[in-house]
Amino acid sequence: PEIPVRNDKPLEVFAGGTGMMLIKRKVFDKLKKKVPSYENDVVDQAGSIGIKEVIHEYFATSIEPETNRLLSEDYHFCRLWRMNGGKIYIAPWMDLGHMGSYLFEGTFLKVD
C-alpha cells in the first residue's frame, strides 16, 4: 500500500545512508559507551606515538540477529541508534546524489 508523504515534514524511516546524514553530536556522546573503543597508539615514521585519542567504533558491519542479514556500516549505525532509543528521519523534499564507482541519484517524492 502507498503511504502518503508530505513534502514539508520529516518522515521517520527504518534506516538510511549516512553519506548525507546530519547527526547531532549528542548521538555520538550517547552511543560511545555502547560501542567498542580503542586508544590510538599508531607510531609515525619518526618513531613517535601520535595523539593518543580514543577511537569509537560507531560504524561497523554486522549481522542483524533477527533476520540474519548483513548490515552495511550505514544500516549498522542506524540499528545501533534505534536500539538505544533513537529515531531516523529523512527529508523527503531533498534530492540526493552519490558518486563513487557508480553514480546514484534519487528523490524520495515522485513528482507528476
Feature names for model-found ranges:
Residues K34-D112:
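C-terminal catalytic/acceptor-binding lobe
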Residues P1-T61:
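Conserved catalytic core of nucleotide-sugar-dependent glycosyltransferases
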